[in-house]
Amino acid sequence: MKLLHSDISTNLIIHNDLEYYVKSGYGGKDIKKWPFYKFIKIGIKENYELAHSLWVNWLVDEFFKYCLEAKSKGGMYQGSVHRFAIEHVKKNKHECWLNPSLLNRTNVKLGASVLVNRHIKLIHSIINKGYQINMDDPIMAVKTKDTYVLKGGHHRAAVVYILGYEKLPGVIVYSKPLWECRKWLIKIKKYLR
């Protein structure tokens, strides 16, 4: 299992290049251009309350732009903000789950706040204990010619970069063809269930 993991240079990491991440301006970009990089940096260097507020507001705006778009394309349909927002809905949960544009801004803001609080807890954990490889939630990347396109673990990557780590440890690295094969196997597995 150890052979599958690599320590990759934080300077060679770019964000997942899915359609709606690209439309938002950070898909396929290096760490310093990710919106949440800025929020994490504000939190670590200055003020967690300000970072929390900016991050939540950004997530709410992104949600209303991309709430009907599939997560597989970088959208937010049935993603974390959506899921946490539903927890605050009193009536019509099922309808709001199927059509997130029915959610009001207050519930989406509460859902986004839950997610940001989890990210801030992650930040504190990395600061206090150092970065820990999580086998239950591995970070995966696709190796291109001279970069690594992260397919998950973006917040962890941003934190270690801000803290000065030169490498992000324990990343499962795929070639592009192997990643595409993996995606198809997952689709087939879902279909067979």
Describe each PLM feature range.
Residues 2-65, 134-187:
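A short, basic-hydrophobic beta/loop patch
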Residues 5, 15, 52, 82, ...:
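Histidine (H) residue identity feature
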Residues 6-9, 24, 53, 72, ...:
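Generic serine detector
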Residues 44-103, 108:
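Extended, charge-rich helix/loop segments that form flexible
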Residues 87-151:
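Short alpha-helix boundary/capping and kink motifs at helix termini
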